[in-house]
Amino acid sequence: SLCNAFPTLFDAIDESETMELDGVSRHVYWEVVDHCYLCDVCYMTKCPYVPPHEWNVDFPHLMLRAKAVKHSQGKTRTRDRILTSTDLVGTLAGIPVVSSVVNAVNRNKAGRRVLEELLEVHPDAHLPEYHSDTLRRRVDVTRNQDAEAAPEAGPTRGKVALFATCYGNYNEPDLGEDLIAVFEHNDIPVRLADTRRCCGMPKLELGDLPAVAKAKDVNIPQLAALVDRGWDIVAPVPSCVLMFKQELPLMFPDDPDVIKVRDAMFDPFEYLMARHKDGLLKTEFKESLGKV
């Protein structure tokens, strides 16, 4: 249930001459760092040494510090710089003719061999499709800007600004449309957030903290302005929600707008469940959900 950082580390310890950490080669340390993708599962569910334990171990953020050091030393591969530029890649791959070519290459064995050679992308790795008909093209960005909020429920204020995310905009626009339909079925007005910049999570996972700060400087003022006008913020991708609710507040604890956005940011299911607890979620389905 954990990433490959742990088996890599434990196997290296077992195979070392001392069978202790001091016997592990330093190059293995970087393999461990590269395998960690900051999912926080070890911190949240497995590690016994997290706070309030006196050792106060936060393994994911320890790995993040190492990634940041590596990036600051100019050791980031070009491949990783490209693949983590999700908004730029999405913009280019979302051009009508280009999207068709990109999708065709991603589905073609010869094309995948080229990708493997150029970017070291495994030929069997699943790659998402790109859409020229993005979510921001499908949904009028001026919709519901002056909408009246539905009744409040728990921490929710009854109207939602959708942060589309790179994946939700370029790769799965149906996801955003479906989410809007569910919210509006429950009388919750939805508009799109103005910002179209990546949340910064891919760059965070790369250790590129200056790029994270730049994304924050674009996104946070726009999202904070929406919060000031009474909007809750929802994002369809969990890692993007985590970025605004946890990572940015940890990096910028003294920025009041970061804290403001954190407190108004919701996972879609978290938001709907809060409404459900106050009896404001419509659960009269035309067809049975069956066994879940």
Where are these regions (language model features)?
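Short cysteine clusters
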Residues: 1-3, 36-47, 166, 199, ...
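Non-heme iron-sulfur electron-transfer modules
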Residues: 2-35, 49-79
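Short alpha-helix boundary/capping elements
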Residues: 11, 41, 90-91
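Processing junctions and N-termini across compartments
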Residues: 30-36, 41, 193
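Short, charged/polar micro-motifs that form catalytic or ligand-binding hotspots
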Residues: 32, 37, 52, 166-170, ...
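Residue-level signal for short amphipathic helical patches enriched in basic/charged
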Residues: 42, 54, 174
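General structural signal for alpha-helix termini and helix-helix connectors
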Residues: 45-53, 246, 250
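Iron-sulfur cluster-binding electron-transfer modules in prokaryotic oxidoreductases
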Residues: 57-292
